[in-house]
């Protein structure tokens, strides 16, 4: 489920104004925790440029067993290099304590951007660091590792399942020199070590959370 808002018309690319996107609520197994995400796209005419700009602010909200009130646990703000952003809610872990999400950042009007895999631990109220997946793959390869990573779910034992693929620079046919994944496939991430191991191509991802529409 994605909170993804744009100031532009999809078919024409014309600026149509500010917009907001809110996901449904994702409930953890056992029902103790709930989460939703929102993204707000604000259109503004920058005084220094002839072109209007679109800037996103995306937020993740979580409520716990002691309160029905949702509180923001992650706020992704625009930066000069990446005015666009969004949050994808992927799933809650089988034990119901950890939320897997994808934090997207990009620059409007270009192919520049990326996905950051994050895990929110509802018990400790902490988010995993942005570099966790890069660190795990670099450790596995034994050198700096560039790749395209996207979270897809949890294994039955509670480890993170993600897809990893080669990393290409914009307009290039060959992956960058640091690209360490030859072809797209499923990988298992141990967030404690951190470490990764490859999964079979036929791996089937289970779903554990409930969606409230």
Residue spans for each PLM region:
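Sequence signature of WD/YWTD-type beta-propeller architectures
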Residues: 1-93, 97-213
């Amino acid at each position: 489920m994605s909170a993804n808002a744009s100031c532009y018309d999809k078919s024409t690319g014309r600026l149509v104004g500010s917009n907001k996107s809110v996901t449904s609520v994702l409930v953890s197994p056992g029902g103790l925790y709930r989460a939703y995400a929102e993204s707000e796209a604000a259109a503004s005419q920058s005084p220094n440029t002839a072109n209007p700009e679109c800037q996103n602010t995306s937020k993740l909200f979580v409520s716990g067993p002691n309160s029905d009130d949702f509180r923001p646990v992650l706020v992704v703000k625009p930066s000069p290099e990446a005015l666009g952003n969004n949050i994808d809610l992927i799933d809650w872990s089988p034990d119901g304590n950890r939320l897997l999400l994808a934090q997207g950042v990009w620059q409007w009007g270009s192919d520049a951007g990326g996905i950051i895999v994050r895990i929110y631990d509802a018990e400790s109220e902490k988010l995993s660091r942005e570099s966790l997946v890069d660190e795990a793959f670099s450790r596995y390869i034994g050198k700096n590792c560039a790749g395209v990573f996207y979270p897809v779910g949890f294994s039955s034992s509670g480890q993170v399942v993600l897809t990893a693929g080669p990393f290409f620079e914009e307009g290039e046919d060959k992956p960058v020199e640091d690209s360490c994944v030859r072809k797209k496939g499923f990988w298992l991430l141990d967030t404690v070590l951190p470490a990764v191991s490859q999964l079979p191509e036929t791996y089937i991802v289970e779903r554990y959370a409930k969606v409230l529409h």
